[in-house]
């Protein structure tokens, strides 16, 4: 009977032995990125089949996925059919089941000429592997794929069912949610994605705040003149910029109120506050003349809110704050600010004493010597999806990374040794959670 430490040592030895092929698979995914998402998915499907997994490719339409406590404006949702790769191994009902998911889609290719390293060759320099999408999220998909390959090399397999899914995620692609609403389930789930925080596996994602994104249209009125330059008549106009500032002040007041009333210990310990309303944009219609009153002004921003606060409650508070502006203001009474919600997701959390968290944390400690902590600052993390949609406890982890393209940077990278350690951690976690038995054949 293998102990957790002994099977971890056996797995770590296999990772060292197969180091080049484990890195090579990630380099293959990087190379396929230039050919598009379908090429990446095909490489994942082929590799999963070679490991003896039962592979299924599932097409779906993101716009028809029924979402629980989540929404997005139609124009924000990715268009057209997408495809998930689903690979299964182990035996359903023979032990606890585990779902791994990551996303194969990356940011649209851009600014490639600014890269110092070839974005599609997986170049390695100073223990970093570089490539387009390597940290978002090719490494995540590669980790759980190679973890299964390592178990096979060890002559081991999970007793319980393990499901590996490569699911589109960006721009509300909703891949994992599509599968969950089609019947995919598990006792627990782990989201594999390099840590954007820069902490690598010193942390576990077990907490995700919810987030709402909004825009508010504020109308104005030009002064009663046909003169092209309106500055001298400004006192006779309704300046939408000034009225937008009143809206901004109302949002600030609500933000201050919520900051006093809403408390979550993890967020408060990390940043001293548990919720925020951030106005990040103000924009008027075409400013072809600075001497004319604008017709309208738009404000936009986002709201973070801690679980378990309901999303509808937060939305209602914003609506009430805007409605209050009409009291005693004849302009807003006749022309109320128009609130548009662009998107919203609900937060979720797994406590640090949950068996899933404890299992993963123990595997990380055995492999790296570090005791991980919870990262509560990754707002709207994909760990929320199995929890909110189907009440499946979910955590996330990933290796050290940096210079992500989604942050406007170049030469995206993942730490090679941390990537290899993550493969060890995931393979060990599979056996700890699902149980181990000799591989067939």
Where are these regions (language model features)?
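Metal-dependent amide/peptide-bond hydrolase catalytic core
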Residues: 1-10, 199, 213-441
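Acidic/His- and Gly-rich active-site-bordering loop/insert found
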Residues: 2-129, 158
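Residue-level signal for inorganic ion chemistry
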Residues: 29, 33, 193, 244, ...
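Short helix-capping segments at alpha-helix termini
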Residues: 51, 154-158, 325-332
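Hydrophobic/aromatic beta-strand patches that form the interior of the parallel beta-sheet core
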Residues: 56, 98-100, 188-190, 278-280, ...
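Fold-level recognition of mixed alpha/beta catalytic cores in primary-metabolism enzymes, strongest
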Residues: 129, 134, 138-255, 293, ...
